Every structure is written in C-alpha cells, then in structure tokens.
Regions:
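Conserved short beta-strand elements that form part of the metal-binding/catalytic scaffold
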Residues: 35-69, 115-121
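Short Asp/Glu-rich motifs
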Residues: 50, 105-106, 128
Length: 129
C-alpha cells in the first residue's frame, strides 16, 4: 500500500529534533549556513533541508548533543566554505577538515552546542563511481 509522506522514503533517516535553548536563533543559524527552509511558528520553528528527505524541528526541552553520542553529518559542496559560514554565524569548528577514506570531513558545534559533521566528496570518490 502506497503511503504519502513528506520525505517519501521508508527506513531512511528523515526526521530530526535539534536541541536549542533559543529555537529561533538556532533555526536562523541553519537557514543561513545550509539554506534550510523554515516553517511553522517563530517560537517553534520546523525545517526541511531542501533535499526532500529530511525534516524536523528545534526542541527546547532537551540538552544539546555534544561530542559524544549519535552524530548527524550534512553533505556539503565545500567543507572549507561551510566552516567559514559556520564561524561567521556563531558556530565553532570542533575538528578541522580531515580525510575519512575518500571523503573530506569536519566537525562543528552550532551556537546551541550541538556537534554535527559535514562532509564532501573528494575527486577520488567522484572518480570511483
């Protein structure tokens, strides 16, 4: 039976809660750095990531996810440019870019203290498809 869905995939990661004390400020950070589309009330913003695969919202009743625990990674076109945007908009670089196999990866903390990763494909990974 077909089921209509906002993200259209079964068993894929599709919905996130992002902890933040100030949901509106955190939403602005992700909008400005990653271009995420915001919706809902300003005090309880939701988002879609622009790919059609991930949606979510900011929650103020949970502690930030620091360096330990499950970590989400966001696919970006350029790790260095994204880290520049992260720091410009109040985030911090937690681990500078490094290679993980054929991927270029870095870790950052958003202004609320959540640690996430970003990654881009290298020319080696793109050539091996």
């Amino acid at each position: 039976m077909a089921v209509d869905s906002l993200v259209g995939r079964i068993a894929g990661v599709s919905y996130l809660h992002i902890p933040a004390r100030d949901a509106a400020a955190s939403a602005g950070f992700y909008r400005d750095v990653f271009g995420w589309q915001l919706h809902g009330r300003p005090d309880e913003p939701g988002f879609s990531d622009g790919t059609g695969h991930v949606i979510g919202r900011w929650v103020t009743d949970q502690a930030a996810v620091g360096a330990d625990g499950l970590r989400a990674y966001i696919y970006v076109a350029d790790v260095d440019d994204t880290l520049d945007a992260v720091t410009t908009h109040g985030g911090q670089v937690v681990r500078p870019p490094y290679l993980e196999g054929t991927l270029r990866v870095a870790l950052f903390a958003d202004p609320a203290g959540n640690v996430l990763g970003i990654w881009q494909e290298t020319s080696d990974s793109q050539g091996s498809r």
